[in-house]
């Protein structure tokens, strides 16, 4: 997976920060978005992020996900 790829969430991932469902459980399963960034370094130093893929679902909503939770469309 690379930056700019269209992806779909294939696992059940519950988030509480969705702008339309603030502070309520919202399942991202089958949601489609675009990989905005892959986090491998911070301030020039390598990092091992637990959720390295930043996926943008809309202008207002982005989420950090793992590779096994996503599939390329």
UniProtKB/Swiss-Prot annotation:
Protein name in the entry: Ferredoxin-thioredoxin reductase, variable chain
InterPro entries, alphabetized: Elect_transpt_acc-like_dom_sf, Fd_thioredoxin_Rdtase_alpha, FTRV
Gene assigned in the entry: ftrV
GO BP annotations, alphabetical order: photosynthesis
Keywords: Oxidoreductase
TM region positions: none
Quaternary structure annotation from Swiss-Prot or TrEMBL: Heterodimer of subunit A (variable subunit) and subunit B (catalytic subunit). Heterodimeric FTR forms a complex with ferredoxin and thioredoxin.
Residues covered by region (Interaction with ferredoxin): 43-46
Lineage: Bacteria, Bacillati, Cyanobacteriota, Cyanophyceae, Synechococcales
Gene Ontology MF term list: oxidoreductase activity
Pfam families in the record: FeThRed_A
